[in-house]
Amino acid sequence: RLALRSPLKFAPQKENFTSSDFTMGQILSQPVTEKHLETETGSRLAYGLLCMQGWRINMEDAHATILDYDDLPGASVLGNKVGFFGVYDGHGGEKAAIFTGKHLHNIVSNTAAFKAQDYVQALKDGFLNCDQAILRDYEMRDDDSGCAATAVIITPKAIFCGNAGDSRTIMSINGYAKALSYDHKPLNEGEKTRICSAGGYVDMGRVNGNLALLRGIGDFEFKRNPD
C-alpha cells in the first residue's frame, strides 16, 4: 500500500475468499507474487509503495502519488505546497480502480472547494464527481466494477483524509498507529440502516448478499439514487 515517512509493520493477513469467488473463476490457482516497489522524495514529502497482484486474475488495485500539485502539468493552483496520495482497492474487475487512480486527484483539484483551500469539501466533492465522470466515460459504460478508495491531501499544516469503503488510512506517530479513516462495513448498524432505508438488504455481512463494503466508487449496480 502506501506509507509516508515512517512505515508501520503489520502481520500478513489471509485473503478472505467466498465460494462465489471460486465458482466465478476470479481466483488464480497460485498467487502472482511479483512486487512493484516505488519510492520518491520531494522537497517536503517522501513516499514508498509496494504493489502485488496476489490471487486475483488481474491486478485490481491502483494508486496515485502527488508530492506537490505544483509539479503537475497545467496546475491550476500554485504555491500552496499541497500533496495528494490515494489507494484504490478494486473489486469485480480493475477498470474503476484504474480510472480513479488516473483521475481522482485531478478531479479533486478542479473543485471550487480545493481552489478555496476547503480540502474537506474538496475530497467530498471529488469522490462524488469521480462517480459522475465514470458514468460519462464511454469506455466505462458497461463496466460493473468498483473500488474502495482512501485518499489524503497533505498541506504544510494539516492532513485531510477521505475514504469510501474499507481501505484504511493509518498514520504513524512515533511508532503508534492512529486511524485517519473509518471503514464502511455492512455490519455497522448505522450503515446497515442506511442501506435498508435505500431499499437494499444485508445478508451474511454483504450488501444484497454480494458486496462486502457499503460505500465506494463505481458499483453502480448497487446505487439507486438517480443523482
Name each model-derived stretch.
Residues 1-227:
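PP2C/PPM-type serine/threonine phosphatase catalytic domain
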